[in-house]
Amino acid sequence: MAVPSELKYSKEHEWVKVEGNTVTIGITEYAQGELGDIVFVELPEVDDEINEGDTFGSVESVKTVSELYAPVSGKVVESNEELEDSPEFVNESPYEKAWMVKVELSDESQLDDLLSADQYKEMIGE
């Protein structure tokens, strides 16, 4: 199972790619595998504020609906609109095509609370 080493991870199975003061957020390969085939993705609008630990959207699979939890706080600067028409990207390409949102960080110190790839692998039993 892919757990890219350059990313950070939340305990709620979101991944975070840090690029300066902006982060890209998605869900992990492990999470999409647990959910099954994704049929719908609901994401916030550009300029929405998200807060660490709060829900910022959801993914619906054939099995269940799962909330997305913000691993950091900040302002949404981009939302992946392709997922509206192609939610299957979450299953096919969780780390590339299926990023969820890009967020301008309001508190960079929150990144310190995230897990490294090794810590995340340990958490999921890899």
From Swiss-Prot:
Residues 22-104 form the Lipoyl-binding domain. Its cofactor is (R)-lipoate. Keywords: Lipoyl. Binds 1 lipoyl cofactor covalently. It comes from the Bacteria. The modification N6-lipoyllysine is found at residue 63. CDD domains: GCS_H. It holds the Pfam family GCV_H. InterPro entries: 2-oxoA_DH_lipoyl-BS (IPR003016), Biotin_lipoyl (IPR000089), GCV_H (IPR002930), GCV_H/Fam206 (IPR033753), GCV_H_sub (IPR017453), Single_hybrid_motif (IPR011053). The keyword Chloroplast does not apply. GO terms for cellular component: cytosol; glycine cleavage complex. One of its GO terms (biological process) is glycine decarboxylation via glycine cleavage system. The glycine cleavage system catalyzes the degradation of glycine. The H protein shuttles the methylamine group of glycine from the P protein to the T protein. Is also involved in protein lipoylation via its role as an octanoyl/lipoyl carrier protein intermediate. Belongs to the GcvH family. The glycine cleavage system is composed of four proteins: P, T, L and H. This is Glycine cleavage system H protein. It comes from Staphylococcus haemolyticus (strain JCSC1435).
